[in-house]
A protein has these predicted regions:
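Cell-envelope/extracellular polymer assembly enzymes that use nucleotide-activated donors
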Residues: 52, 131-136, 163
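Short, acidic, metal-binding catalytic loop of nucleotide-sugar glycosyltransferases
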Residues: 151-161
Length: 284
């Protein structure tokens, strides 16, 4: 008897998701030989010993499978962490230690912070940033919108080494060209713009801007975005320079603090769709 609630539909295997929380849960099957090889459960991780185990196990094998079916239910009772994170606070301390040690084993210096309410962790990588970031922004006029974007980048970004490349596609507004000259005057070392007056093709414009870039990392940005936090580019750069990472995305918000998207899921809505559209930015 009981009421089903808080469904947890788990995604496919993702090593970085596993660093943010133990999304494997309790129903996990591991070969006994592998469990013995890694030393089984360890003392000192009470409350999160299963998390520590799967972190170590997934470092020793690439054969990790996800069964996309609802196979078990987890009860919620007064003595369970399923009810509240306050029931077993030591479990989250142990989990933080397990993550920290996993990152140390992998040679990735990082700071691990517990996110109360989410029951997960934020990983801040501490390796020195290497290489310049080139921001490529396509536009057709939209002077006021673009001005908000560019001023927010230059006034709020605390990254030490970046450049901005604007690609104009068939712009006609005289105010736009005047603004481009003003930006060249204000940011002579970090700003350039080019005209590409071919028929509109978003991918072609991005490729054109990439050819003009001098950075080791390319950051594709729409002209209607605005920087909120100064460390935005440093965080993206710290992830993109990791050997296992090919591309990095971020959470985008509308002006009313709801989510525009927090990633793209293949298959959602038929082909692909944005996740968490309309949720509050700090929602669970």
């Amino acid at each position: 008897k009981g009421l089903h609630s808080d469904a947890h539909f788990k995604p496919q295997w993702c090593p970085d998701h596993l660093l943010s929380r133990n999304y494997f849960g309790h129903l996990v099957v591991i070969r006994s030989a592998l469990v013995k090889e890694i030393g089984g459960f360890r003392e000192g991780f009470e409350g999160s010993q299963d998390y520590d185990l799967v972190l170590r196990a997934t470092e020793r094998t690439t054969h990790i499978e996800h069964v996309p079916r609802v196979l078990y239910h987890w009860r919620i009772h007064a003595a369970s962490a399923a009810l509240s994170e306050d029931v077993k606070p030591y479990a989250y301390v142990a989990a933080k230690t397990a993550i920290t040690e996993a990152l140390q084993r992998r040679g990735e210096p990082a700071e691990v912070d517990f996110l109360s309410g989410y029951r997960g962790y934020r990983i801040s990588f501490k390796a020195p940033l290497k290489g310049k970031v080139s921001i490529v922004i396509p536009t057709k006029d939209k002077t006021e919108v673009l001005a908000t974007c560019l001023h927010s980048i230059f006034n709020r970004t605390d990254h030490p080494d970046f450049e901005v490349i604007v690609v104009s596609n068939n712009s006609k507004d005289t105010a736009f060209f005047a603004f481009m000259k003003e930006m060249e005057r204000l940011q002579p070392e970090r700003f350039r713009w080019y005209e590409n007056n071919t028929p509109f093709n978003f991918s072609a414009l991005m490729n054109f801007g990439t050819e003009k870039a001098t950075g080791e990392h390319i950051l594709f940005l729409n002209n209607d975005t605005e920087v909120i936090h100064g460390d935005w580019m440093r965080i993206m750069h710290s992830w993109s320079q990791r050997p296992s990472i090919g591309a990095v995305g971020v959470k985008l918000l509308y002006h009313n603090d709801t989510i525009q998207h927090a990633g793209v899921v293949i298959g959602l809505g038929g082909v692909a769709g944005h996740t968490f559209v309309g949720y509050h930015k700090d929602g669970p």
